[in-house]
Amino acid sequence: MANTPSAKKAVRKIAARTEINKSRRSRVRTFVRKLEDALLSGDKQAAEVAFKAVEPELMRAASKGVVHKNTAARKVSRLAKRVKALNA
C-alpha cells in the first residue's frame, strides 16, 4: 500500500495510464480484426483500405509505448505480406 503522497500520486498516474493504454491496445486490435475479416472474405479493396488504417494505428501505439516498435513493425510487415498475397 502506498503511504507517501508521492507514492499515492504514482498509483493514480499508473491507473490513469493503464486505462489509456488499454483503450489504445483495444483500438489496435479492432483495426487488425477488421483487416483480418477483409482478408478472410477475399475482398482486395476492403483489405487495402483496412491495411491503410491499421498501419498508422499500430505505429501510433508503438510511439506511445503501448507496444514495442519492433513488435509493431513485425505485425505491419506480416499484415502487408498477407494483403500483397491477396492481390497476387
From Swiss-Prot:
Under the heading InterPro entries, the entry gives: Ribosomal_bS20, Ribosomal_bS20_sf
Please provide the Gene Ontology terms (biological process) for this protein.
translation
Q: Which UniProt keywords apply?
A: Ribonucleoprotein, Ribosomal protein, RNA-binding, rRNA-binding
One Pfam family per UniProt = Ribosomal_S20p
Alphabetized Gene3D superfamilies for the sequence: Ribosomal protein S20
GO MF terms, alphabetically ordered: small ribosomal subunit rRNA binding; structural constituent of ribosome
What's an example GO cellular component term for this entry? small ribosomal subunit
Superkingdom to which the source organism belongs: Bacteria
PANTHER family per the record?
Answer: 30S RIBOSOMAL PROTEIN S20, SMALL RIBOSOMAL SUBUNIT PROTEIN BS20C
NCBIfam families the UniProt entry points to = S20 (TIGR00029)
Family to which this protein belongs: Belongs to the bacterial ribosomal protein bS20 family.
Main function: Binds directly to 16S ribosomal RNA.
Q: What is this protein called?
A: Small ribosomal subunit protein bS20
Q: What taxonomic ancestry is recorded? A: Bacteria, Pseudomonadati, Pseudomonadota, Alphaproteobacteria, Hyphomicrobiales
